[in-house]
Curated annotation (Swiss-Prot):
Function: NDH shuttles electrons from NAD(P)H:plastoquinone, via FMN and iron-sulfur (Fe-S) centers, to quinones in the photosynthetic chain and possibly in a chloroplast respiratory chain. The immediate electron acceptor for the enzyme in this species is believed to be plastoquinone. Couples the redox reaction to proton translocation, and thus conserves the redox energy in a proton gradient.
Catalytic activity reported: a plastoquinone + NADH + (n+1) H(+)(in) = a plastoquinol + NAD(+) + n H(+)(out); a plastoquinone + NADPH + (n+1) H(+)(in) = a plastoquinol + NADP(+) + n H(+)(out)
Record-stated family: Belongs to the complex I subunit 1 family.
Lyase recorded as keyword: no
GO BP terms, alphabetized: photosynthesis, light reaction
Top-level EC class as recorded in UniProt: translocase
Entry keywords, A to Z: Chloroplast, Membrane, NAD, NADP, Plastid, Plastoquinone, Quinone, Thylakoid, Translocase, Transmembrane, Transmembrane helix
Enzyme Commission number(s): 7.1.1.-
Pfam assignment, any one: NADHdh
Membrane spanning residue stretches: 30-50, 98-118, 127-147, 164-184, 273-293, 304-324, 340-360
Record's protein name: NAD(P)H-quinone oxidoreductase subunit 1, chloroplastic
The protein's assembly and partners: NDH is composed of at least 16 different subunits, 5 of which are encoded in the nucleus.
Amino acid sequence: MIIDTTEIETINSFSKLESLKEVYGIIWMLFPILTLVLGITIGVLVIVWLEREISAGIQQRIGPEYAGPLGILQALADGTKLLLKENLIPSTGDTRLFSIGPSIAVISIFLSYSVIPFGDHLVLADLSIGVFFWIAISSIAPVGLLMSGYGSNNKYSFLGGLRAAAQSISYEIPLALCVLSISLRVIRLSNSLSTVDIVEAQSKYGFWGWNLWRQPIGFIVFLISSLAECERLPFDLPEAEEELVAGYQTEYSGIKFGLFYIASYLNLLVSSLFVTVLYLGGWNLSIPYIFVPELFGINKRGKVFGTLIGIFITLAKTYLFLFIPIATRWTLPRLRMDQLLNLGWKFLLPISLGNLLLTTSSQLLSL
């Protein structure tokens, strides 16, 4: 049987095209993920620089100024130093738990960014249960901290891990109830818990349509609970230096210690982004009764300009809000453990339940 050479060449060209399609498909799938990871990394570096500059201003001292212009590269210098340090492992600890703990903490927080809309439908995964996906994923991070504390075989580390788990449980419930209070109205309008739908529900009435004005009590409870979830002062009991040396981080060094450092700022950034999405109107400019398309002529200039404006507005709101947790770290004293638990269970939980009851009643009366 004789096969024409042209037929063989045609078959080979088709096979090459199919393989190229598969390669381009993989690249097209990975490109948004890599872009998001790169953006998050740059965002964390900016937060570290902002915190150092703001803390220097509060304490009336000079902040970082030698590593790059205005000290902007100081975080990169610190990261390089941690990469070059020796990675020590306790000889009497559980090596597996000790090594897995930091990775669980970082990966769980990274997954939370997948449901955050940075612009009009500019979201990696627009899930119908987006906000509760974030709550479910964020509850995994304390498990990694507890594993790190237990695997270190150190009493200070173990106490720090236990404190992290207790603190997360205490403040996760009020935070979830505040999110549920916001979601009730969105469910009635669009039958969805998508973060995109939550932002669009706030865009109909401009500045006064923000959930900040509809849910002022929930906003305050959410703010306090998110600070506790981020383990920021005055809620940094799991790693209190005067009591526990460094808490669950005591036995860590090198890149694993750096992962905890990154995780704390990743958690701070994702909490501020969710405050922007849930309470501050997301990517909408929210000048009263003037929306972004009318103000900037986005419909005339194309979708790219509108997307860039949406990203800029979201990040501007986020970084303006970040001043609150950064300032509280350097101005408020640390709570005791009993005060922290009493605040969560005896005050924030009843207040969030009452807020949910009021929201439910108002929704039923408006039907």
